[in-house]
A protein has these predicted regions:
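Adenosine-cofactor binding site in Rossmann-like domains, unifying the SAM/SAH pocket
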Residues: 25-43
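N-terminal Rossmann NAD(P)H-binding glycine-rich loop of SDR-like oxidoreductase domains
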Residues: 2-22
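NAD(P)-dependent short-chain dehydrogenase/reductase
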Residues: 119, 131-180, 184-188, 220
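C-terminal substrate-binding subdomain of Rossmann-fold SDR/epimerase-dehydratase oxidoreductases
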Residues: 18, 166, 170-262
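SDR active-site strand-loop-helix element
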Residues: 7, 52-56, 94-100, 143-145
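Conserved Rossmann-fold NAD(P)-dependent oxidoreductase catalytic core, especially the SDR/UDP-sugar
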Residues: 79-121
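Glycine-rich NAD(P)-binding loop of the Rossmann-fold in SDR/ketoreductase-type enzymes
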Residues: 35, 65, 69-80, 116, ...
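NAD(P)H-binding glycine-rich loop region in Rossmannoid oxidoreductase-like domains
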Residues: 37-73
Length: 262
């Protein structure tokens, strides 16, 4: 029997994952500080956790403001969890939420073994955690999420920021970048699939479809019935997932699930 626990249940993705599964599967919240390994040990042992999904951690913006706390929460806590799991007489599946920001820009769709080029402290520490997990544990899935969006996303993220600026008739400065957007409910469905099939290793989690920032903003404008005030530079970058590994395991996108839809 699978006993699934999550940390970071108040986070954007963690909260959606819980709500998405509320009537589907039982999920137990770890509600205490992820850095408190003593409490975590008691929680895992008491509940006989078989699958642990770690949504806890500082965001990219918060990491840039507090390097020490970022290292503590986004790396040292992961190290402590892995060390603890290795002490158990069984090995819970550890699902680690990572990021596409560990990659650099690429004209081609990015594979799991594509060149690594973290572009921020947040990405560097995610990569550091990945490396520790890979070296010291076997039963893991590392999920490199691309541009996740959905309801109630914090305003510091791209989509809610654009919605706010369009509503307020603010000028929007962008470049000719192309990104891979995936809805948070689809991410939840992917995680369920990975748990049910016990898929291990590193997986890109995106739609596999590249869309320009301009096209996304115009779609938002159409939805709001307001024309965005765009200033577009000639700078270009592209980060789009190759999702063949995920689909080769049997995951199938629903009709229109790859399309951007707010």
């Amino acid at each position: 029997m699978k006993i699934i626990a999550i940390s970071g249940y108040k986070s954007f993705i963690g909260n959606h994952f819980y709500k998405y599964n509320k009537k589907k599967i039982k999920i137990i919240h770890y509600k205490k500080d992820i850095n408190n390994i003593f409490e975590l040990k008691k929680f895992v042992i008491k509940n006989k956790i078989t699958h642990f999904v770690n949504f806890a951690g500082l965001s990219r913006i918060k990491c840039s403001k507090n390097k020490i706390e970022c290292m503590k929460t986004n790396f040292k806590s992961i190290k402590s969890i892995i060390n603890f799991f290795n002490e158990l007489n069984y090995k819970p599946m550890f699902i680690f939420i990572s990021t596409c920001h560990v990659y650099g820009n690429s004209n081609n769709k990015i594979k799991e073994n594509s060149k690594i080029s973290p572009n921020s402290l947040y990405a560097e520490i995610k990569l550091k955690s990945e490396a520790y997990i890979k070296k010291n544990y076997q039963n893991y899935s590392i999920l490199r999420l691309f541009n996740v969006y959905g309801p109630n996303q914090p305003k510091s993220f791209f989509i809610p920021d654009m919605i706010e600026k369009i509503k307020n008739n603010q000028s929007i400065k962008i470049d000719k970048s192309v990104r891979d957007f995936i809805h948070v409910n689809t991410v939840s469905r992917v995680i369920n699939f990975i748990i049910s099939k016990e898929i291990t290793g590193i997986l890109n989690i995106g739609s596999g479809r590249g869309q320009s920032l301009k096209s996304i903003i115009n779609l938002i404008g159409n939805k709001l019935d307001k024309k965005p005030l765009l200033e577009i530079s000639n700078k270009k970058s592209k980060i789009v997932a190759n999702i063949k590994f995920l689909t080769s395991k049997g995951f199938k996108f629903k009709k229109n699930e790859k399309n951007f839809n707010i």
